[in-house]
UniProtKB/Swiss-Prot annotation:
EC code(s) of this entry: 2.7.11.32, 2.7.4.27
The family this protein is said to belong to: Belongs to the pyruvate, phosphate/water dikinase regulatory protein family. PDRP subfamily.
Top-rank taxon, per record: Bacteria
InterPro entries in UniProt: Kinase-pyrophosphorylase, PPDK_reg
Name of protein: Putative pyruvate, phosphate dikinase regulatory protein
Length: 272
């Protein structure tokens, strides 16, 4: 089967439409879906050029135009030429108009404006990089979230994902022979999250990691008995701290992050 082509059109950067398309496409993993992004489409002439190309290549269209007129042009073109399309933003704008009884401002890219929220996110990302992998124990006392876990339990990618939600995250790998920094015991246990995994899953992940490095996959690093010992050690630490433990086996980064933020929000509500 030939690849499915999806055009992402927007009068801003198109990130929202792209993310929606990716989320939906994840349910169709057997298909080869290829995306082409067309950001900052704000003139009729440029829009018509892109639409003509979409028609020529039989591409589906996902779009976010806060300019209602451009949005209508796309929708009408797709309907007239029987091109599959999805208008990502218009229904949401209509819903908020109904709620507020106010028309949208129609300013493309407002969500990406350089506001306080943007700089907080940049600071959170810098924090995650600085305090990744237990580099500096002082970060544990400043963090909104502290992640603990043995090697290959998604600590670093999860830290960066949460940083994009403006949370300052520090993480620490748990190794049986290594001493736990004193700072960990001073952190509120509600801010600490223990990450674990199934031994078989972790064995597979570590073996793949060694293969990627061009090394023998059958080492002590991927040894099942050693992995079980590491997980047992980590579990003892989690119980001693009294933190929430999350098994990341078969969970996406997004799912794990949601469990963490929900736990934080619940604690905030209870303390409010």
């Amino acid at each position: 089967m030939s690849a499915i082509k999806v055009f992402i059109l927007s009068d801003s950067i198109g990130e929202t439409a792209h993310n929606v398309a990716l989320a939906a496409a994840a349910q169709f993993s057997d298909y080869d879906i290829r995306y082409q992004r067309f950001p900052f489409v704000r003139t009729d002439s440029l829009l018509q050029t892109v639409l003509s190309q979409a028609l020529k290549e039989h591409a589906a269209i996902f779009h976010t135009f806060v300019d209602r007129r451009l949005s209508q042009i796309v929708n009408q073109f797709c309907e007239a030429h029987e091109l599959p399309y999805y208008d990502v933003i218009t229904p949401a704008l209509d819903t908020f108009s109904q709620i507020t009884h106010v028309q949208p401002s129609n300013h493309p890219g407002t969500v990406h404006a350089l506001n306080t929220n943007y700089f907080d996110r940049i600071n959170a990302i810098e924090f995650a990089v600085t305090y990744d992998d237990g580099k500096n124990p002082s970060g544990f006392l400043e963090a909104d979230v502290v992640l603990l876990g043995v090697s290959r339990t998604s600590k670093t990618p999860l830290s960066l994902y949460l940083a994009n939600r403006n949370l300052k995250v520090a993480n620490l790998p748990l190794v049986p022979q290594a001493q736990i920094p004193d700072e960990i015991w001073k952190v509120d246990p509600k801010k600490i999250f223990g990450l674990t995994n199934d031994p078989e899953k972790l064995n597979d992940i570590r073996r793949q990691r060694m293969v990627q490095y061009g090394l023998n996959p059958d080492t002590m690093y991927s040894n099942t008995d050693k992995i079980k010992a590491e997980l047992e050690y980590a579990d003892k630490i989690f119980k001693k701290i009294g933190c929430l433990v999350i098994n990341v086996a078969n969970k996406s980064i997004e799912e794990t992050a949601t469990l963490i933020t929900e736990s934080l929000n619940t604690d905030d509500t209870n303390n409010g």
